[in-house]
Regions:
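Nucleotide-sugar donor-binding catalytic core of glycosyltransferases
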Residues: 2-277, 282, 286-302, 361
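Generic anion/oxyanion-binding catalytic loop in active/binding sites
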Residues: 243, 269, 305, 326, ...
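A structural signal for short, well-ordered beta-strand elements
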Residues: 247, 308-309, 343
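Conserved acidic donor-binding segment of nucleotide-sugar-dependent glycosyltransferases
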Residues: 306-312, 322-325
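Charged catalytic carboxylate motif
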Residues: 315
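Short amphipathic alpha-helices within nucleic acid-binding modules
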Residues: 319
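A charged, aromatic-enriched C-terminal amphipathic alpha-helix characteristic of glycosyltransferases
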Residues: 325-358
Length: 362
């Protein structure tokens, strides 16, 4: 099978991971990214992606391949404007080639207009909200609010993040697990601020990490309550003070912290699904997370692979105290979760799942 992968120039964890997985499953020469995305090649290497030799296919070359039916599947990797515009440039040559759309955006909205624009036969959604049930075609039936276009019914499938082979590399030296629990992330949701504040003020727990802000982030990002947000807004929502800004960790230090942690916390950001959710398990660290509100096929199980805490985190200190000294229980869960990750949640497995659905449904 040969796939044309229509790209957007911006970083997009879902589409970038799926490209990585497709190259592993189909081999690089059978996955053509158009326009060629520097992040996938040597111009702007990304630490979480396996780099591939540059193959800057010109527009006329790609159009010829489509017209000559040498392309078996077109994947529009994002509903963002760059990918949509690239598809429009190719649309006249599409010639009946099956098309699918990936949507890795933070919200739960189904972008029916984008699906219609590209003529998507299947729609893959990262933030695929519960409740759901399996329909008679074997597909996931989303809430009624999703059905803005009846042509998509039974053709929308969950596609959460995963972990790439490049991001599973372990630190070269053995590190001591001297941190009870850690969390590092942008202050993109007030729940992150609440969780960090709770862990910092809990006595007897060794916590490391925090939330960071970009230079343009405002003071309201640090508010842990609606009252705090409203107060910041009434003040004109000034920039966050310098003392409150944690520097963003580089990749090496972040991975080292995961490997020093007995447990690591995943908290929703713009969407529930975070890359951290999968990276923690890849580091063989016990994942503690709020229960997901999205569909994750073959998700980890509470008490067997991971620990799901309350949405308000009130039980989090007790969880940390109970498990930090129980090395055997933690190790059993960590090893079970790691095996489950390799079986179901690598970028290669995600790509295989996507391709199998395309072969069956298109």
């Amino acid at each position: 099978m040969k796939v044309l992968y229509v790209t957007d120039p911006g970083a997009d964890y879902l589409s970038d991971q799926i490209y990585d997985g497709l190259c592993s499953v189909l081999e690089r020469q059978n996955v053509i990214d158009f326009p060629a995305k520097p992040l996938y090649h040597d111009q702007q290497p990304a630490p979480h992606l396996t780099q591939n030799p540059d193959d800057d296919s010109a527009l006329h070359d790609v159009e010829s391949m489509i017209r000559e039916r040498r392309i078996d599947l077109m994947i529009v990797s994002s509903p963002r404007s760059g990918a949509m515009e690239a598809f429009r440039r190719l649309n006249e040559s599409a010639n009946g080639t099956p098309v699918v759309l990936l949507d890795g955006e933070d919200d739960g909205r189904i972008r029916s207009d984008a699906a219609r624009c590209v003529g998507a036969g299947l729609y893959f959604k990262r933030e695929y909200k519960k409740p759901t049930k399996v329909n008679r075609n074997g597909g996931w039936s989303p809430p009624a609010t999703f059905h803005e276009d009846s042509r998509l019914e039974g053709r929308i499938y969950p596609l959460p993040f995963s972990v790439t082979a490049a991001s599973m590399s372990h630190p070269s030296s053995m590190l001591t697990r001297d941190v009870d629990i850690s969390f590092v992330g942008r202050a993109s949701h007030r729940k992150r601020v609440r969780a960090v504040n709770l862990l910092r003020r809990t006595k007897g727990i060794r916590f490391e990490g925090g939330v960071y802000l970009d230079a343009a982030d405002r003071r309201s990002k640090l508010a842990a309550s609606w009252l705090g947000i409203a107060t910041s807004k009434l003040m004109g929502d000034p920039p966050a003070p310098a003392w409150a800004q944690m520097s963003r960790m580089n990749v090496q230090d972040y991975r080292a912290l995961l490997h020093r942690s007995k447990m690591a916390l995943s908290v929703r950001g713009g969407g529930f699904d975070t890359v951290r959710y999968w990276e923690i398990v890849a580091a063989k660290t016990l994942l503690v997370s709020e229960p997901p509100d999205i569909v994750i096929p073959h998700n980890f199980e509470h008490g067997r692979h991971v620990i799901f805490c309350r949405h308000d985190f009130h039980d989090l200190p007790a969880i940390v105290r109970r498990l930090r000294d129980d090395d055997q229980v933690r190790q059993e869960m960590v090893e079970a979760a790691y095996r489950h990750l390799l079986a179901y949640h690598t970028s290669e497995r995600r790509a295989t799942y996507l391709l199998d659905l395309c072969r069956r449904m298109l």
